[in-house]
A protein has these predicted regions:
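Acyl-donor-binding surface of acyltransferase catalytic domains
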Residues: 1-9
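C-terminal/domain-terminus segments
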Residues: 8-38, 129-145, 209-221
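Short, surface-exposed beta-strand/loop "edge" segments at domain boundaries and coil↔beta transitions
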Residues: 71-73, 159-160, 197-200
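Acyl-donor binding region in acyl/amide transferases
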Residues: 93-176, 180-182
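Alpha-solenoid HEAT/Armadillo repeat architecture
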Residues: 143, 224-229, 233-237
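Accessory, usually C-terminal, subdomains that scaffold auxiliary metal cofactors
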Residues: 168-230
């Protein structure tokens, strides 16, 4: 297994954060998917089906956070491009319940991508690895790919974090931007960042860190994570 649900970490000495086009690295896609499903099952979600179609979609890019030897997967996220081979995950999840979702998406000033598939193993819960570092890297990647806008379907927890990156509730969709998502048995928040290049309304520190990655996609940075200093090896490729 490439994830650990029993041994929470207080500190990791080093991690790797890299990106790739899904169709170019099936092995890493499988590790990403295995870890994500393992976490969902650990929290009691009943999985009657799952799709692997995104692995074969040229419009999907993956951010994976892992050990530097690639033996342990800690978390990650995906970017899926609107208008590629697949409908977006948000369309599959709530499209039947939000009748004007497709109209809203097609009215965007593309290219538009969905930030989705965000997860982290329980082993690194509380360290921000699967949330802050994953979102930061995905937004940096989106800018390098030339995307203009991003949307994201957020849980209550990720919605609170999303404000740091300039995502705002789309009040014209659902119930003022919220919809009860039976798959997670909670309300989901439909959010939108209209300018990921300039990161409108984002936190100044996060904007600086994202632009630093964009300017230096292959980068090593030492940061305090948890109880100690972690060496972060970025390799953000398009």
């Amino acid at each position: 297994m490439s994830y650990n649900i029993n041994s929470p970490e207080k500190h990791l000495s080093e991690i790797s954060i890299r990106s790739f086009r899904a169709v170019d690295d099936l092995e890493s896609c499988m590790r990403f998917r295995e870890g994500h499903l393992g976490v969902l099952e650990a929290f009691g979600f009943k999985l009657t089906s799952s799709t692997e179609d995104w692995m074969f979609d040229p419009g999907t890019h993956v951010v994976i956070i892992e050990s530097t030897d690639r033996k342990i997967t800690y978390g990650g996220s995906r970017l899926q491009l609107l208008g590629s081979k697949l409908e977006l995950p948000i369309q599959s999840a709530i499209g039947e319940d939000v009748s004007n979702l497709d109209e809203y998406l097609t009215s965007r000033k593309g290219p538009v991508a969905e930030l989705c598939g965000l997860w982290n193993s329980v082993a690194v819960a509380g360290l921000g690895i699967g949330s802050v570092y994953s979102i930061r890297s995905a937004i940096a990647l989106g800018g390098l790919l030339g995307y203009n806008e991003m949307i994201a379907l957020c849980s209550a927890f990720t919605y609170r974090i999303s404000h740091k990156y300039g995502f705002r509730l789309v009040e014209s969709l659902g119930e003022g931007g919220k919809i009860f998502y039976a798959g997670a048995n909670q309300y989901a928040h439909i959010t939108h960042q209209p300018d990921i290049l300039n990161l409108i309304d984002s936190d100044e520190i996060e904007r600086f860190k994202i632009n630093e990655i964009r300017l230096n996609p292959v980068l090593r940075i030492d940061e305090i994570i948890g109880d100690g200093l972690t060496s972060i090896h970025y390799q953000i490729e398009t």
